[in-house]
Amino acid sequence: MSNGIKVKKRNGRGMEPLDLDKMHKMVEEACKGLAGVSASQVEIQSGIQFYDGITTEEIQEILIKSASDLIDLDHPNYQFVAARLLLFSLRKSIYGKMMDLPDLENHIYNCTNIEVYDKDIFTKYSKEEIEKANSFIDHERDFLFTYAGLRQVVDKYLVQDRSGGGVFETPQFMYIMIALTIFAEYPKERRLNYVRRYYDAISRHRLNIPTPIMAGVRTPIRQ
């Protein structure tokens, strides 16, 4: 269903009708399982801000802001609605979809190919070790974030193009890459166990990471 508004596609190639049904399903997904929240309330708050020629990124930001504006003492779960909407937008911008993310090897390959990850990761670890590390990743842990927490990670810590604004990783890929980089020089027979345990601790937010490590340890600048 459309209301006549034309939307500029994310890839910049042409316009398409605003799909209200698709938007509703996404907001419903962001509200799923959370008490005291309403997809309709988020949509009502945001709907009057749409205009002809709006981009899909702008629509997403409007929805995120609408959900975050609803956060108060009586409705704290909107902080998770806003976080989920931000996460959906992040995944869509990086991978072109919200679910079914790439495996770790493909993700690392893409990021080393554009020189945002340190290419030495492929000399430090074998293909089999990277496949094993991939099995440690739980992308559902992205949904543990509150909106404020995820916004800080997106704005300050995820590997990105600071001039162009593109982001190249999601939180779980950030966490596993931090763990792999930190333990790369440890004995091979034990290091994957350390990687798994450290990844579990930081991805569940049980352990704080110093800013230089969180922001840069997996990149070519290595700090």
Predicted feature descriptions by range:
Residues 1-223:
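Extended catalytic cores of very large enzyme megasubunits
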